[in-house]
Amino acid sequence: MVGLASLGLVFEGLVAPVGAQARLPTRFDADVARALRAFNVPGTAIAVVKDGKVLLAKGYGVQRLGDRTPMNAHALFQIASNTKAFTTACLAMLVDSGKLAWDDPVTRYLPDFQLYDPWVTREFTIRDLVTHRSGLGLGAGDLLWLHSNYTRREVIRRMRAARPTSSFRSQYAYDNVLYAAAGEIIPAVTGLSWEEFVRQRILAPLGMTQTRTGVADLRPGDRLATAHAVLGGRLRIVPLDTVDNIGPAASLISSVTDLAKWVSVQLDSGRAGKRRLWSAGQTREMWSSQTIMPIKDPRPSLAILRPNFAAYALGWRVRDYRGHKLVHHTGGLAGMTSKTTLVPDKRLGIVILTNGESSLYEALTYQLLDHFLGARPRDWVAAFQAAARGERASADSELGIVRRMRDTTSRLSLPLARYAGRYSDELYGDATIDLEDGGLVLRFSHSPAFVGDLVYWGHDIFRTNWRTPNLEDAFVVFTLKPEGAVEQFTMEAVSPLADFSYDYQDLRFVPSR
């Protein structure tokens, strides 16, 4: 039950005059400049669509650290998981045309599709692919595609080895690889690749001429923003993630100029001018709650953001804010973060793309939402910075405990050379540990970026020092057989703030020779 205090929060400060919400906030440009400085992000591009009109499509800051080239509305960003709504829109078109149904079994179209249990495999539907209720753990299979040379088909095939962490359809756990499988249904039905279907059925009709289906689709002259992250306390340029091998989950590259067109067709229930891309009924389906998401209490500075409901729909998340339903999604890859937000009953859409890693896109989204919903302004920059400080303090406390547990006085159970060798994990594949210059070096055989020196931590535990600086380090824990040989090694992320795509905990490497 919603208490009176909560209702007071929802309706607090509705003071803007009638008509004010048809315009952008005053001093918005100055507010964006302040946010860029506060969050240490080089640049952002923002689009706002209201009542069928593009109120804003503009860049702020710069495209690259150390370069004065200004950000603009045509700069390209990786939009990461904002791609998922494009994939479900493609499937919705096929539902409209009678080519498939959301509740069709996946194996009807992908006969080789297989998961951890024969019954689950048989019962698994297209809807299950796109609603994060598979029974697999959070981010299951992400290390199969992250910086790897596996093809999309091989990534999907290897998921049969992923172990469940809950019952099928019992709880929410975000999964990227299953969206790649959803995308593979499109060529099975139409003969067109996911990439070509997106181009023909969405990008071309909407005139989204600046949007690319992945890194391989980039063309000479494309204005791609540079990715940035804070490493070792300093803002640095980081390599672009190439995620074409799970394209339907995360690979689209776009600008706010193009995404304003995408938001407009969403808010008009699939209609673009006189042409309809998908039906109003499919819009309702894609925006309907499918999998309940757990609601956690936010940090105190963000208490007002605690929703009354939260769920995953079809390629979108849905929740409430100040009495309105939000349809939204975020996207994040190395050095680039973004968010798309729709408020259907206000015919409002907001897109924020950034070339850094921070909650800047959240702060600016809520500033714009408050303005257009007629709420009293809040300092969302300060609120999200306070929350981030709290998260870092908690993580630092946990890391401090871990560091104090390091025991380099303990002796290794085996000579270093006995830990070296070739290992295999049923899900990921092969890895090698080599003895080089008196130390151990771990290599993931299908992920060239994952090469790391193993630093002894104590008690047959090592910590990776990946040579690619923006990868999340992991503990490598060896288990020995009674006779003294290595039985296996497992891994887990060092930092509590590590992105869930570093699903080291799912790996169990055993000697393969």
Q: Over which residues does each language-model region extend?
A:
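Sec/Tat signal peptide C-region and signal peptidase I cleavage site
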Residues: 16-20
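Surface-exposed patches in mature extracellular/periplasmic domains of secreted proteins
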Residues: 43-47, 118, 142, 171, ...
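Short acidic alpha-helix initiation/capping motifs at coil-to-helix transition points
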Residues: 176-177, 360
